Amino acid sequence: MIASKFGIGQQVRHSLLGYLGVVVDIDPVYSLSEPSPDELAVNDELRAAPWYHVVMEDDNGLPVHTYLAEAQLSSELQDERPEQPSMDELAQTIRKQRQAPRLRN
């Protein structure tokens, strides 16, 4: 069984770039189409670990969907960041929906 380090709705940081993001989905292993070696230089162990769909903001403040390995992320300890309120709002909305899901027809 593969355990993920981060949860849906959790705020995380890109370990190398420092960008703040919110986890919106988790894949237990790398699940996108098979990349060429030039596109993704990762080993098999990294591909077998959890991968995360993370929404981050670009330099213009626009949301960007990213697909990152668990090793590329670190925990974000603060609950609120005044410099990026949209990431706080997104995380809060996702957590609320997970606590009280709406029924769909």
Swiss-Prot record:
SMART domains: YccV-like. It is found in: Cytoplasm. One of its GO terms (molecular function) is DNA binding. Keywords: Cytoplasm, Stress response. Its main location: cytoplasm. One of its GO terms (cellular component) is cytoplasm. Pfam families: YccV-like (PF08755). One of its GO terms (biological process) is response to heat. It comes from the Bacteria. Residues 95-105 have a biased composition (Basic residues). Residues 74-105 are annotated as: Disordered. Belongs to the HspQ family. Involved in the degradation of certain denaturated proteins, including DnaA, during heat shock stress. This is Heat shock protein HspQ. It comes from Shigella dysenteriae serotype 1 (strain Sd197). The lineage of its organism: Bacteria, Pseudomonadati, Pseudomonadota, Gammaproteobacteria, Enterobacterales.
